[in-house]
Amino acid sequence: YFNRYGNYPGVGAWQSEDSPWRDAFYFHEDGSYDCWWGVGNMPAINESSELVRERLLGKDGVIRKWLRAGAHGWRLDVADELSDDFLTEIKKAVLAEKPDALLLGEVWEDASNKISYGHLRRYLQGSELDSAMDYPFRDMVIGFLMGYKNAYQAAEDIETLRENYPREALACALNLLSSHDRPRIISVLGGGPDESQLPESERSKWRLDDNSMGLAKSRFWLATLMQMTFPGVPSIYYGDEYGLEGLTDPGNRRTMPTKEDLHDFDTFAIVKNASAVRRALPFMIDGEIKAFALNDEVLAYNRTGKDGESATVIINRSLRNSHRVTIPALGECASDVISGHECEIH
């Protein structure tokens, strides 16, 4: 389509004004063209081009073709770069092919009130995205476990998401702890440095020491438990289940170790056990949530199902202290899902 470097047969938009794909991009009189954040090999696409719309949104276009082939939805990279009108057209194409398909957007902030390029976006108003990557969830988890915010502030963050997001959008938000754009969670929870503190030659090789890794694993259990008991869809970034380390690119995108190279299965057991809690309590998937703080270091939230069954998740972030707390409860008895112990309610 663009073919600036002549790698493909035929004449691309960059090579000739007569190319049928010329109006699919934004060219200027001097031959320069618009591109994403100045990256020359990522030319900006003209959303109003009929050729672009047909190739992406038409009956045999990219969106519908791959849904027809078996995909169950699409994740749109950098949704902020797409106009509301174009997102609406993408949603129409998705629904025309597969009414129950998911349309998810990469949005780093609260998707219900995001302002990009000076405009309040309409992501979650029904005609565009079904939901978004839940970076606010990630920020809340890290902020609380690392001591950047107390339990009252973390509970407020949870309540803000609950109040701002439509129930359906919160239920299918992508709850991530790591991504290809952010440092890996195990490195963050172990107190990994700001990359600007490291020479570029050391960034991809940086690793936690043994003491820091032990601390990171303790926090990883809490983070993963929150991920598996929070409304939305848990998203495990490849290698996180094996404690793969890494700051930002390229450290967070390095090759997945082979089975023979894996020697530490603590984090795998953590993910497995936290996942078991989610599977054992179906209302963790579609139940209501209500968050509250028990003191500065203890965060809690209730999950309640349609039949009234409920569970309270309690997170003590303290490295040294146990806390005696009082929690609201319904019913006559309760059981500890993790230990299996039962107790009477007084």
Predicted feature locations:
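Active-site-proximal helices and loops of the catalytic beta/alpha 8
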Residues: 2-10, 62, 72, 77-173, ...
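Conserved, mostly hydrophobic/aromatic
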Residues: 66, 76, 103, 180, ...
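Surface beta-strand/loop "capping" patches
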Residues: 284-308
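C-terminal beta-strand-rich structural cap/linker in extracellular carbohydrate-active enzymes
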Residues: 344-346
